[in-house]
């Protein structure tokens, strides 16, 4: 009975470690595009979106993972 309990506990711990590792791999790093998956930026980052214009014509929206609490201004 103790062996069965111990085996089940080990399997649960291994499963949790694998899930956590998978979640870490799935995040999008700093300054990478997050247009299709805005909620997947790594921790400490947010997905910030901008409307892109070419010669005054809107060409769609692009989003990038940037640092939280950082504001960028045009030059």
UniProtKB/Swiss-Prot annotation:
Main location (coarse class): secreted
Compartment annotation: Secreted
Tissue: Expressed by the venom gland.
A GO MF label: toxin activity
Modification note: Contains 4 disulfide bonds.
An annotated GO cellular component: extracellular region
Propiece residues: 22-25
Signal peptide, first to last residue: 1-21
Keyword Lyase belongs to the record: no
Listed Pfam families: Toxin_35
Keyword annotations from UniProtKB, A to Z: Disulfide bond, Secreted, Signal, Toxin
Similarity remark: Belongs to the neurotoxin 19 (CSTX) family. 06 (U6-Lctx) subfamily.
Name of the molecule in the record: U6-lycotoxin-Ls1d
Source organism of this protein record: Lycosa singoriensis
């Amino acid at each position: 009975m103790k062996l069965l309990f111990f085996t089940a506990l080990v399997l649960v711990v291994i499963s949790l470690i694998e899930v956590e590792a998978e979640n870490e791999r799935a995040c999008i790093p700093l300054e990478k595009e997050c247009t299709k998956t805005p909620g997947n930026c790594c921790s400490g980052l947010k997905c910030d979106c901008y409307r892109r214009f070419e010669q005054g014509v809107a060409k769609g929206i692009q989003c990038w993972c940037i640092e939280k609490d950082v504001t960028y201004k045009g030059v």
